[in-house]
């Protein structure tokens, strides 16, 4: 049977015992009191509260945040009214700017391609892909500015409901 030498009868149980001890000894070392070292298991401390404060914002910037619920979150101070007016003016200016840009692009596209000035074309009727990209980009910018403005105004008017 070609075993290479005589087998000892206790070799297999000895190897099994050695494998069992090696697998059991790979755990975290014990502290002098007998409990495992938590710094080895959790290097940054306990993880029981992970995610508890995720997404929460500080309310220190807003007056009357947690005092009484019948008070408005922002007072009608001249600073707040001025800030809201500034937001409204920026939105109006950006809308006018985008309308001017779209008007200039449409006029240059009509006259350069021999189109009639009274003929209005939709964005899917353009001849090349670059004009379509320009139209869609200006619409995306307009939508982005509108969403940004609306979210800022909503957050300024009611910051507690905007978070949920």
Curated annotation (Swiss-Prot):
GO terms for molecular function: neuropeptide hormone activity. Keywords: Amidation, Cleavage on pair of basic residues, Cytoplasmic vesicle, Secreted, Signal. GO terms for cellular component: extracellular space; secretory granule lumen. Pfam families: Bombesin. It is found in: Secreted; Cytoplasmic vesicle, Secretory vesicle lumen. The keyword Signal applies. InterPro entries: Bombesin (IPR000874). Its main location: secreted. Disulfide bonds: none annotated. The modification Methionine amide is found at residue 54. GO terms for biological process: neuropeptide signaling pathway; positive regulation of peptide hormone secretion; positive regulation of phospholipase C-activating G protein-coupled receptor signaling pathway. Residues 1-27 form the signal peptide. It comes from the Eukaryota. Residues 58-164 form a propeptide. Stimulates the release of gastrin and other gastrointestinal hormones. Stimulates pancreatic protein and fluid secretion, and increases acid secretion from the avian proventriculus. Belongs to the bombesin/neuromedin-B/ranatensin family. This is Gastrin-releasing peptide. The gene is GRP.
């Amino acid at each position: 049977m070609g075993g290479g030498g005589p087998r000892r009868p206790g070799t297999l149980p000895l190897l099994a015992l050695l494998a069992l001890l090696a697998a059991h000894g790979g755990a975290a070392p014990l502290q002098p009191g007998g409990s495992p070292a938590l710094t080895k298991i959790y290097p940054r401390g306990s993880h029981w509260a992970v995610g508890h404060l995720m997404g929460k914002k500080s309310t220190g910037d807003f007056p009357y945040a947690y005092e009484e619920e019948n008070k408005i979150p922002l007072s009608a101070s001249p600073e707040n009214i001025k800030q809201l007016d500034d937001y409204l003016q920026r939105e109006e200016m950006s809308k006018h700017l985008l309308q001017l840009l779209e008007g200039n692009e449409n006029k240059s596209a009509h006259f350069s391609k021999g189109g009639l000035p009274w003929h209005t074309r939709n964005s899917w009727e353009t001849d090349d892909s670059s004009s379509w990209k320009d139209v869609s980009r200006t619409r995306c910018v307009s939508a982005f500015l509108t969403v940004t403005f609306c979210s800022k105004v909503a957050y300024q008017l009611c910051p507690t409901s905007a978070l949920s």
